[in-house]
Amino acid sequence: MSNRRLFLKSIPIMAAAGAVGMAGLARAANPMVAETDPQAAALGYKADTTKVDQAKYPKHAPDQHCGNCALYQGGTAAQGGCPLFAGKDVANKGWCSAWAKKA
């Protein structure tokens, strides 16, 4: 088999590998949402669930955190995406008033 034919056959594999690699780079580029961000402040977001004001958010429970919220898109990672904060990551151990138990 010629080198050219071998090269042409490998293009789809290289393209797929490149796409997967680029997806990882794009994912890693998301900044963390700041607690002072207007959307975060409106939802009472805290990067550490233990720092939530119980008087202000009486429905908050110590075992509630972004990592076990239905909206969290980070799996078991220390930070991950949340549709409420487009383009920004939240802390796995964070919390906001939109917390909803994972099914």
From Swiss-Prot:
Keywords: 4Fe-4S, Electron transport, Iron, Iron-sulfur, Metal-binding, Periplasm, Signal, Transport. InterPro entries: High_potential_FeS_prot (IPR000170), HIPIP_sf (IPR036369), TAT_signal (IPR006311). GO terms for cellular component: periplasmic space. It comes from the Bacteria. Residues 1-28 form the signal peptide. One of its GO terms (molecular function) is metal ion binding. PROSITE patterns: HIPIP (PS51373), TAT (PS51318). [4Fe-4S] cluster binds at C66, C69, C82, C96. The keyword Ribosomal protein does not apply. Pfam families: HIPIP. It is found in: Periplasm. GO terms for biological process: aerobic electron transport chain. Homodimer. Specific class of high-redox-potential 4Fe-4S ferredoxins. Functions in anaerobic electron transport in most purple and in some other photosynthetic bacteria and in at least one genus (Paracoccus) of halophilic, denitrifying bacteria. Belongs to the high-potential iron-sulfur protein (HiPIP) family. This is High-potential iron-sulfur protein. It comes from Ralstonia nicotianae (strain ATCC BAA-1114 / GMI1000) (Ralstonia solanacearum). The gene is hip.
